[in-house]
Swiss-Prot record:
Keywords: Autophagy, Membrane, Mitochondrion, Phosphoprotein, Transmembrane, Transmembrane helix. GO terms for cellular component: mitochondrial membrane; mitochondrion. Its main location: mitochondrion. It is a multi-pass membrane protein. The lineage of its organism: Eukaryota, Fungi, Dikarya, Ascomycota, Saccharomycotina. It is found in: Mitochondrion membrane. It comes from Saccharomyces cerevisiae (strain ATCC 204508 / S288c). It comes from the Eukaryota. This is Autophagy-related protein 33. The gene is ATG33. Belongs to the ATG33 family.
Amino acid sequence: MSVCLAITKGIAVSSIGLYSGLLASASLITSTTPLEVLTGSLTPTLTTLKNAATALGAFASTFFCVSFFGAPPSLRHPYLLYGMLVAPLSSFVLGCASNYQSRKYSKVSKESSLFPEDSKLAASELSDSIIDLGEDNHASENTPRDGKPAATTVSKPAEALHTGPPIHTKNLIAATAIAIVGFVQAVIGVYGEGQFI
């Protein structure tokens, strides 16, 4: 094996390792962080991760392609083709999921705009937010005649605090699994050629 081919394979395997690591980091961040934080303060960080992962995926695919087609026919191993397809396949999974979710969200937003009762309900909740904090009035309003405290309802903003994973997490985990499997098979393939011995 020529030195140039060994270098391109090393760069390809390293790039796909970094790519799968970035996808794993993004999966971990999105599965453990509340949705409001993801759409708010973490958006620039996730955008940077997405751009870096895209660049590394393209870089890895390019070097796997150069390694496969630049090698003599006896050294064209299938792991080079599989490594070349990892980034496009995981990007396809994420792209299809993103397209499906954006259509679903636009449909839900159109349906929710047809029902203005939610805005009236929110306005009535805001008008109830002014409370007289006098001692006698406050105690008599919260305690019914049977002596038990009145049940309190949770307002809409507190209900909106969503701590579960967003919908894209399953698709991101699938793309991460594809990248990790591609990285592992590439490392085994390079090791099988005797490059690490």
